[in-house]
A protein has these predicted regions:
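Short, surface-exposed secondary-structure boundary micro-motifs
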Residues: 81-82, 107, 250
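Hydrophobic beta-strand signal
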Residues: 76-78, 103, 246
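Gram-positive cell-envelope targeting signals
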Residues: 1-32, 36-38, 143, 166
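Conserved PDZ fold ligand-binding element
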Residues: 65-87, 297
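PDZ-domain C-terminal substructure recognizer with occasional recognition of PDZ-binding tails
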Residues: 28, 36-38, 71, 91-130
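Serine endopeptidase catalytic core focused on the charge-relay Asp
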Residues: 121, 125-296
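PDZ/PDZ-like groove recognition
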Residues: 36-71, 275-280, 285
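Short, Lys/Arg- and Gly-enriched loop/turn segments at beta-strand edges
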Residues: 82-93, 114, 256-258
């Protein structure tokens, strides 16, 4: 009976725990459920094109990138054979071109392709190709579980996507950072709400090694969040049942608390939208604090 209860908590603890580990369930017997927020910093593999925009030249508007076939959501990984990993790298290569055509290596929908772009000189004399790009991101999310044997973790239950394009951020490297919840933007009808976190870059807890549709994954380098916690048995996805459950979450400071929820629906593992389960918050204390499930939980 005790093991059954522990298994029930393990599979319903953080919305998508069982879905995150279902592919590994045959190999992993137990995991430590966490529920603590963490800061997440990621550097992109290449430079993500967020917007295409006109270059203002003395002759009028020019659209070098758009006219060459570059699209929003593309990732630029090299310029004329030179790898770029930041906006600064990209701008330097465009400046070095002196207005001569450059070959951009792009990744679009997982496939590589090359396009030739001729930079335009703007009204200030700088060479530009007419894009707004992003090379990194930072935010907070919830650490879902840690494998006590290896220190490997899973977090979020969904991938980290660029807020402008919706494209999964191509990961070069990243880190988890100790975080505290400073405030909560309550969820309302039509507005998801969000946890507002505070973190500093010198309190690293682990690495981010994968950014996937199912969540982010990596290895903990600091065990302070889970060294005193116990592991619970892992269930297969087909063992999940609807009904009462509990979640662990951190919505004030650095305190992790249990709250009551109800698992309303369980989706099949091959769900086309990648859903794991639908839950309804039944705990009045959590509803009073957050209005329900909010971003970052």
């Amino acid at each position: 009976m005790q093991q059954s209860k522990a298994k029930k908590i393990a599979i319903s603890l953080l919305l998508t725990l069982a879905m995150l580990v279902s592919a590994q369930a045959a190999e992993i017997s137990s995991l430590i459920p966490i529920g603590h927020t963490v800061g997440i910093q990621m550097s992109a593999e290449g430079v993500l094109v967020v917007h295409l925009r006109a270059v203002q030249t003395p002759e009028g508007e020019a659209w070098p990138a758009r006219d060459a076939g570059v699209s929003e959501g593309d990732t630029i990984v090299s310029v004329s054979g030179t790898e770029v990993s930041s906006n600064d790298d990209l701008q330097k290569q465009i400046a070095f071109s002196g207005g001569q055509p450059v070959e951009l290596e792009l990744v679009r929908d997982g496939a590589h392709q090359n396009v030739t772009v001729t930079p335009s000189q703007d009204e200030d004399g700088a060479y530009r190709i007419g894009i707004l790009a992003r090379d990194s991101m930072a935010g907070i999310g919830t650490l879902t579980y840690v494998d006590p044997e290896t220190g490997e973790y899973g977090s979020l239950g969904h991938g980290i996507c660029d807020s402008e394009t919706g494209v999964l951020m191509p990961l070069k490297e990243g880190s988890l950072i100790y975080s505290m919840v400073g405030s909560v933007q309550r969820g309302e009808a039509g507005e998801p709400g969000a946890l507002q976190g505070e973190f500093t870059a010198d309190s690293t807890l682990g690495t981010v090694e994968e950014n996937t549709e199912s969540g982010i994954f990596g290895t903990m380098t600091d065990a302070s969040l889970y060294s005193s916690l116990e592991a619970v048995p892992v269930a297969d996805a087909d063992e999940i049942r609807t009904g009462d459950a509990e979640i662990l979450t951190n919505v004030e400071g650095d305190a992790v608390e249990k709250y009551s929820v109800q698992v309303v629906k369980v989706y099949p593992e091959d769900d086309e939208y990648g859903r794991g389960m639908m839950i309804r918050v039944t705990d009045q204390e959590l509803l009073d604090k957050t209005g329900g499930i909010v971003q970052g939980m």
